[in-house]
């Protein structure tokens, strides 16, 4: 039987149990405990588009806060930056980082490869600053050679890519449905089928 906890019980400053309801019947129960450990998963369902389980609604964070706990470093949420926002049938499905690793290009509504504008100074030495250099890296790596140039900015860390996409959307350069475009069509169907079969199957 599974329960959803709605509140923590306290005596003074000490947590002594919780109140929860059964997920199927909705019956309310109170539990007393000598100690309570919150292990409740993430908070991804706080965002309208995500690939996380429906359960990841931040309940554990809220329970702790309501009970008087101090929450720290709440801004440090790791996002996987690419997922589907349209059409509705695939909304929230993750698009693997392999798509970018195989040469996927992030563009905005104006057709610009905007990631070149978001390379942090600390990563500038490792990432290409021209389309030509970026494309050369892809050609070398996907053909099994050692790269002789810097990697594409689409392969920056997840936090940088997620913030860049969000910045483009907020600036009015996002897709019609609130995202960005990830294009790998230049690799051709045969290469996509070989290297990214699951992505092809999900989104063909």
Listing of model-derived features with the role each one plays in the protein:
Residues 10, 23, 108-109:
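Short, acidic, Ser/Thr-enriched surface-loop or helix-capping motifs
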